[in-house]
Amino acid sequence: MAQYSLFTSESVSEGHPDKMADQISDAILDAILADDKNARVAVETMVKTGMAIVAGEVRTSTYIDLEDLIRDVILDIGYNSSDVGFDGASCAVLNAIGKQSADIAMGVDEANNKDLGAGDQGLMFGYATNETDVLMPAPIYYSHRLVEKQAELRKNGKLNWLRPDAKSQVTLRYDNGKPVAVDAVVLSTQHNPDVSQATIREAVMEEIIKTTLPAEWLHADTKYHINPTGQFIIGGPVGDCGLTGRKIIVDTYGGMARHGGGAFSGKDPSKVDRSAAYAGRYVAKNIVAAGLASRCEIQVSYAIGVAEPTSISVNTFGTGSIADSEISKLVAQHFDLRPRGIIEMLDLLRPIYRKTAAYGHFGREEPEFTWEKTDKVAALQG
């Protein structure tokens, strides 16, 4: 990986339409897993003016009141009135969920001592870097924190003119591979019509940007773009159609690591798009936490119905304290990257996924996020 002098990442709030869709899909997954941990779930959501549509494939023994669940998620995010353009209590809810293909189930399920096969073919990446305490790239980490702060101030009423939809973008200046300054910040937030742009700019600067970004990184030449197009009253699903899985770079490393292309939300852990990406993060984070490298990227790949990965690759970009080939041996020794091994290693058959669906799947040391633990450090250090 080349050394950047500038690097930019973005994030979006829980009220962004694509993130609404992700949260609905993961809320459905959670509700099913809470009662049927062996369910197969692949649920996609679309939200647009006045409606939420869910579709996909599910195999489960439980029953979920999807309409009430979907409405509750929308209302919880903050779309609770026609005044903000979308109301979870009155929007149409359309359900086009069907059964999982028997052909897929036959190839994936465990039976007659056959191990759980990967739910699909594909390639996944995990990444960690020591440029932040949580071993995440700084641009995406701080982009998440900005929109998370926007939501906090909206929900606690401190800035009661804020509305749910918001986006952030952070450009950091790097010196010798380490972030040293903020070059530019973009924050666009939906708002009520009766607040002035001057009030918005001052509040966003003082209450969001300055309380979130490290003061020592802000300087006289930092560029601030706060609602740069002017008013942002029309937002959420009225302003843009939202779809599950359309923020895969926001969900991961903000572009600083590669991405295999598979989205996460709405997928149960038999889908390696999700579970193997979580495992990749777990492996890479433990390697960096153990001091074996200052940056580490893991690639894994799978064939549908086959348990063993078709490949496992390690790249430390020349930062490793030992050879990448030696780190690869340690990975094989200490991490089981078969689908069943990942599920058991990270305890993934739990209703923990809606929480992942906004503000990043990685770099948040929540108790449910087992892939953020660094409990393999001692074993890796030998």
UniProtKB/Swiss-Prot annotation:
The record's section on Gene3D superfamilies has: 3.30.300.10
What does the cofactor field's note say?
Answer: Binds 2 divalent ions per subunit. Binds 1 potassium ion per subunit.
An example Pfam family from this entry, by short name, is S-AdoMet_synt_N
Q: Where does L-methionine bind?
A: E57, Q100, D240, K271
Tell me which EC number(s) this protein carries.
2.5.1.6
- What residues bind K(+), as annotated? E44
Q: Which residues bind ATP?
A: H16, D165, A166, K167, D240, R246, K247, A263, K267
The Swiss-Prot or TrEMBL record lists the needed cofactor(s) as:
Mg(2+); K(+)
An example Gene Ontology CC term for this record: cytoplasm
Which InterPro entries does its entry note? ADOMET_SYNTHASE_CS, S-AdoMet_synt_C, S-AdoMet_synt_central, S-AdoMet_synt_N, S-AdoMet_synthetase, S-AdoMet_synthetase_sfam
- GO terms, biological process: one-carbon metabolic process; S-adenosylmethionine biosynthetic process
Q: Where does Mg(2+) bind?
A: D18
* Keywords linked to the UniProt accession: ATP-binding, Cytoplasm, Magnesium, Metal-binding, Nucleotide-binding, One-carbon metabolism, Potassium, Transferase
> Cytoplasm: present as a keyword of the record?
yes
Location relative to the cell? Cytoplasm
Q: Per its UniProt entry, what is the enzyme's top EC class, as one word?
A: transferase
Q: Does the keyword 4Fe-4S apply?
A: no
Q: Which residue intervals make up region (Flexible loop)?
A: 100-110
GO MF annotation terms: ATP binding; magnesium ion binding; methionine adenosyltransferase activity
Q: In which pathway does it act?
A: Amino-acid biosynthesis; S-adenosyl-L-methionine biosynthesis; S-adenosyl-L-methionine from L-methionine: step 1/1
What family does the entry list?
Belongs to the AdoMet synthase family.
Q: PANTHER family attached here?
A: S-ADENOSYLMETHIONINE SYNTHETASE
* HAMAP family (alphabetical): S_AdoMet_synth1 (MF_00086)
What does the function comment of this entry state? Catalyzes the formation of S-adenosylmethionine (AdoMet) from methionine and ATP. The overall synthetic reaction is composed of two sequential steps, AdoMet formation and the subsequent tripolyphosphate hydrolysis which occurs prior to release of AdoMet from the enzyme.
Entry protein name: S-adenosylmethionine synthase
